Amino acid sequence: MTQIIHIVGGGLAGSEAAWQVAEAGHRAVIHEMRPVRGTEAHRTDGLAELVCSNSFRSDDPEGNAVGLLHQEMRSLGSLIMRAADTNQVPAGGALAVDREGFSAAVTRALEQHPNVTLVRGEVEGLPPEAWGPCIVATGPLTAPALAEGIRGLTGAESLAFFDAIAPIVHRDSIDMDVAWFQSRYDKPGPGGTGADYLNCPMSREQYDTFVAALVAGEKIGFKQWEGTPYFDGCLPVEVMAERGPETLRHGPMKPVGLTNPRDPLVKPCAIVQLRQDNALGTLYNMVGFQTKLTYSEQVRIFRMIPGLERAEFARLGGLHRNTYLDSPRLLDATLRLRARPSLRFAGQITGCEGYVESAAVGLMAGRFAVAEAAGRPLAPLPQSTALGALIAHITGGHLMADGEANAPRSFQPMNVNFGLFPPLERAPRNETGRRLRGPEKAALKKRALTDRARADLALWLEGARDGAARPAAAE
């Protein structure tokens, strides 16, 4: 029997959830409020618009948890990964995309799908119970009326953190007599050559002057949001500078793995990297340079960077507030709201962090909804998989800071990482049986974790097809 499943929100999570529902033969109705109502971060009415970076991060499925997540999503027929692969741009070992082409591909695929209906307009308040099963994937910029409805239903306050956007520079305004193309350690990646980033070097004097300017620069006022924490994975560059004069050169401006071909014997104190932002190669974004500086200060301070003295900005950085649920308290293991099980949540509003993670949670929300509609609930995903580890963190991670009833909540937005995976039962050893140490141990451990994940996902998929739970693979 065909089921109508409503999806509120047409971002990465909502788009992926709708695709999974539609591909399973059910009807997906996407409710997207743009362009009827905009947000402080979105610029278009396209589905799956990327509002921050254009990078999906590492595409390495052997040594990186997000690369493994890419692989798992591809194996489950992810629309988001298909569109990313089709619209990739050079980015070293990362998977980066032409943001406009990517959004257009997702929008086109959903608009043309016979099982998808796209409704433009805001859902004011909670979805009506008459809708039946519904997936709420409204993201970190959930409209006030819906956010208030969620709070009223759950009796819980959503937590919040700031998110900052990095500037984008016109390629032809970058001084190529100063900057050079190189990926860190010359590492190639999907669609790349090993020389995919533009690098702008700084001497010690230039770096110290730049850091001082960041600290002293005029910032956007945000008194109404005081006390709201930042997510460490998206700290504004000036906040990093305020943490200490050496923070940036050991973070986004680290010079390791890069050599200036014009002066190969002199090691820069720091390097600013820019990554291709569109397929034409005409736009580059400043890697790690999310900011809450005022627009005029951004232009002044960022033009202090060697090679960017005459930079023309296609987009300046900005600041917005993100909100997310206390998901371990509010959601069950299949992302249903305990207070109203007909509602599922997906994407960043659940407390995952990152484009790929948001889409991954949307993928699983769609599959959970389809399985429930068919009367064949899915077995829990093995936590040994990237998808399972992410869902387990969202639905079961960190209820209390110290276990006390009145303690503050410690649940925070999280990127997928190997720390979310169950430990291996046996420490990795080499071919001779010797226990390993250092980098060799770390590399082999990651390989063992990814091998286990692939085996366990294959068993889970077989069980899902058979409609029965299967045991996890042996270590």
Swiss-Prot record:
FAD binds at residues 9-14. Its EC number is 2.1.1.74. The keyword Nucleus does not apply. It catalyses: uridine(54) in tRNA + (6R)-5,10-methylene-5,6,7,8-tetrahydrofolate + NADH + H(+) = 5-methyluridine(54) in tRNA + (6S)-5,6,7,8-tetrahydrofolate + NAD(+); uridine(54) in tRNA + (6R)-5,10-methylene-5,6,7,8-tetrahydrofolate + NADPH + H(+) = 5-methyluridine(54) in tRNA + (6S)-5,6,7,8-tetrahydrofolate + NADP(+). It comes from the Bacteria. It is found in: Cytoplasm. InterPro entries: FAD/NAD-bd_sf, MnmG-rel, MnmG-rel_CS, MnmG_N, TrmFO. Keywords: Cytoplasm, FAD, Flavoprotein, Methyltransferase, NAD, NADP, Transferase, tRNA processing. Residues 427-447 are annotated as: Disordered. Disulfide bonds: none annotated. Its cofactor is FAD. GO terms for biological process: tRNA methylation; tRNA wobble uridine modification. Transmembrane segments: none annotated. GO terms for molecular function: flavin adenine dinucleotide binding; tRNA (uracil(54)-C5)-methyltransferase activity, 5,10-methylenetetrahydrofolate-dependent. It is an enzyme of class 2 (transferase). The keyword NAD applies. SUPFAM superfamilies: FAD/NAD(P)-binding domain. GO terms for cellular component: cytosol. Its main location: cytoplasm. Belongs to the MnmG family. TrmFO subfamily. PANTHER family: GLUCOSE INHIBITED DIVISION PROTEIN A, METHYLENETETRAHYDROFOLATE--TRNA-(URACIL-5-)-METHYLTRANSFERASE TRMFO. Catalyzes the folate-dependent formation of 5-methyl-uridine at position 54 (M-5-U54) in all tRNAs. This is Methylenetetrahydrofolate--tRNA-(uracil-5-)-methyltransferase TrmFO. The lineage of its organism: Bacteria, Pseudomonadati, Pseudomonadota, Alphaproteobacteria, Hyphomicrobiales.
